[in-house]
Amino acid sequence: SGFSLVELDGNIAVIGNGAGLVMSTLDMLTDNGGKAACFLDVGGTATTESVYKALTLISNMRNVKAVLVNLYGGIVKTTTVASAFLKAYDDEIIILPVFARLMGSESEKSKEMLKDSETQLSGSIEEAINKVVMEINK
């Protein structure tokens, strides 16, 4: 499938690329009062199709109330993930609030792709975490 998805007992889906980035994002989220519903590591072989499939799985999890994305483009370009999100929005797969920090390879292009979407882009992961925790605690 090109990704690993682990279910937890919170209400925020965490998406990242690479185990280290995903784990540190989970720690930061927990430290700021958030609870992960699942974490998705899109890995180094992600395609638009595999990320779309993962978003479909996340959208079917009843406890998920928001999505937090922390990507650093390298092997996997951030535009690959942005394309999957745009398709998921078009197909009404993702109707949850999405908060994202995108850096690295093609991140400026992916931010441009997502600027008119429902995704709320942040300049840092700390900002994205604060926004998602505030959304959940409304």
Regions from the PLM with identified roles:
Residues S1-V69, M103-K138:
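ATP-dependent carboxylate/acyl-activation modules
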Residues L57-N60, K87-D91:
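Short basic/hydrophobic patches in alpha-helices and adjacent helix-turn junctions
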Residues L71-V76:
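Glycine-rich, proline-tolerant flexible connector loops at the mouths of alpha/beta enzymes
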Residues K77-A88:
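Short Gly/Thr/Asp-enriched flexible loops that form oxyanion-binding sites at enzyme active sites
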Residues A88-G104, S122:
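Short, acidic/small-residue loops that bind anionic groups at enzyme active sites
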